[in-house]
């Protein structure tokens, strides 16, 4: 985002759609500024996802429910999002946060299995795109945390007797709300260098992809060194894309 900001491209972006950590970045950026977004990540505690109790203790106490509750805690991340995400101060035209409906809150992981079956095999979509500016502050905060809640790794976010998980479970490239909003040019920032986006039945829309040349490494590594490496890699890859456009 810093490279897109410095090149002047970001100011022309009217809609943003994100899933998982992309949803968090979009929500914090849209609620504050590019400088504040960077400050959040450069100052995040290295043990941000550490649980108060060891996993073995929780397994002995809760058995399989411990897995359903998540291996790691989202408390610190949730607190950070509470401080920096506000639909009241959103300055982008519209931001969509992607979440995956994991089914009945009382069904545990079986609810997610059922939702996956319905989404992928029965084509009954279980992905939800939430417009940040239409949510209350509490709803916006819960939506961003849910979008980052990787099943088993983190606990689901519960709402209206359903459990909601990482948006990437059902849509890792959430461009649908952008197309429905009338966007005719979309920039996709990929975090998986092995993934190739294959647009289907998209007419009149130009798709750009910014892809990483290097592996991003551990997603739960919040050491200062790793965060700096990720930041630099993202900046260089985006800048390379920006510079390549100048000569097209």
Which role does the model predict for each range below?
Residues 1-19, 27-248:
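Patatin-like phospholipase
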């Amino acid at each position: 985002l810093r490279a897109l900001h410095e090149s002047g491209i970001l100011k022309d972006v009217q809609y943003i759609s994100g899933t998982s950590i992309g949803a968090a970045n979009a929500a914090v950026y849209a609620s504050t500024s590019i400088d504040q977004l960077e400050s959040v990540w450069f100052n995040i505690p290295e043990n941000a996802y550490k649980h108060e109790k060891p996993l073995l203790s929780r397994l002995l106490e809760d058995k399989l429910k411990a897995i359903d509750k998540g291996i790691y805690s989202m408390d610190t991340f949730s607190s950070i999002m509470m401080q920096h995400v506000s639909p009241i101060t959103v300055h982008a035209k519209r931001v969509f946060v992607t979440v995956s409906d994991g089914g009945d809150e009382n069904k545990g992981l079986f609810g997610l299995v059922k939702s996956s079956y319905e989404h992928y095999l029965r084509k009954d979509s279980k992905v939800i795109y939430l417009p940040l500016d239409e949510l209350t502050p509490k709803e916006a905060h819960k939506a961003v945390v849910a979008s980052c809640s990787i099943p088993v790794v983190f606990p689901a976010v519960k709402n209206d007797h359903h459990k909601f998980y990482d948006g990437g479970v059902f849509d890792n490239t959430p461009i649908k709300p952008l197309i429905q909003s009338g966007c005719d040019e979309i920039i996709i920032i990929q975090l998986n260098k092995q993934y190739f986006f294959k647009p289907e039945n998209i007419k009149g829309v130009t798709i750009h992809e910014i892809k990483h040349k290097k592996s991003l490494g551990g997603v739960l590594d919040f050491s200062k060194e790793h965060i700096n490496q990720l930041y630099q890699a993202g900046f260089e890859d985006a800048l390379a894309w920006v510079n390549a456009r100048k000569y097209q």
